[in-house]
Amino acid sequence: EGTHHKKISTLFEKLSETPGSRIIVNMPPRHTKSEFASYLLPAWLIGKNPKLKIIQTTHTAELAVRFGRKVRNLMELQVYKDIFPDVDLRIDSKAAGRWETGQGGEYYAAGVGGAITGRGADLLIIDDPHSEQDALSETAMEGAYEWYTSGPRQRLQPGGSIVIVMTRWSLKDLTGKLLKAQGSDVMSDQWDVVEFPAILPSDKVLWPEFWKKEELLRVKASLSLGKWNAQWQQNPTAEEGAIIKKEWWNIWEKEDIPPVSYIMQSYDTAFSKKETADYSAITTWGVFKPNEGDPEAIILMDAQRGRWDFPELKAKALQEYNFWEPDMVI
């Protein structure tokens, strides 16, 4: 049991006492978000309120039905019946993804994009609405949001609550879209957002009982920085919309650096040698004309990156400055 499990439990206890809750929990892969949100939570809430109507969704119908089967099987255990003696499953409605309680409660599982018309929900659970393939497609991301707004969100009954648990993928994923809507319209759903990065700002691991820091660092080394920050640190960055566009850049095919009229050197510094610390970076740029008559352009002449403590960084900066003799330092 990790500290994040205790925080999630407290969050869900508050949910059970607060009609109309809007909760988003962003967590890294393999940190038991589904175990809590799509297994324990619905079983516990139906035990407390056997009339509860739940719609459970995830990125595939197969996975959503699997969650439904797990919840149903848990409710059929004697230990569950001992704790919640006032709830039972209807014998004639016990399909894995579509079952009812004898007291009028309902559970309905659907994949993202699936039809849920004719269903009402006191609780909507959305667990990882995006697959890895969806994350590569802006169209798929947009489709998931459109499905949410036109489908599940419209099935919520007065006083109904929404729980979204997911790993972040980009600023255009469901969390990103909902937070953007929240910021642009005060009448839109206002979300309580809880983010759990795999490695905390304190440099400690979120769940040390399960994940060792060395293992997480190996995961980090195997991913691009953007994917690590999004999926594991819950901190996605913009893929586009930057002031300087990726497509503006070309590769300088010649071996020698062209003559430059002006040299700029920039520093982005950190002061730690820890493996999880940010890098310090020193880049040197030159202003030049690619061809006679062309407008001026800039070229990256040198780049240095490393984790240096302050004395090392100072020495490295002096070395780079003396070598390139820049006209400007940023």
What are these regions (language model features)?
Residues Y267-S280:
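An active-site-proximal beta-strand-loop segment
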Residues D203-T269:
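ATPase catalytic-site recognition across NTP-hydrolyzing enzymes
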Residues T283-I330:
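Nucleic-acid-processing active sites and adjacent nucleic-acid-binding tracks
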Residues T139-P201:
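ASCE P-loop NTPase helicase motor core
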Residues E1-R22, D268:
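Pre-P-loop entry segment of helicase/translocase ATPase cores
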Residues A96-S150:
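Conserved RecA-like ASCE ATPase "motif II neighborhood" in helicase/translocase motors
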Residues T57-G113:
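Conserved nucleotide-state-sensing and coupling region of NTP-binding domains
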Residues G20-L41:
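Walker A/P-loop
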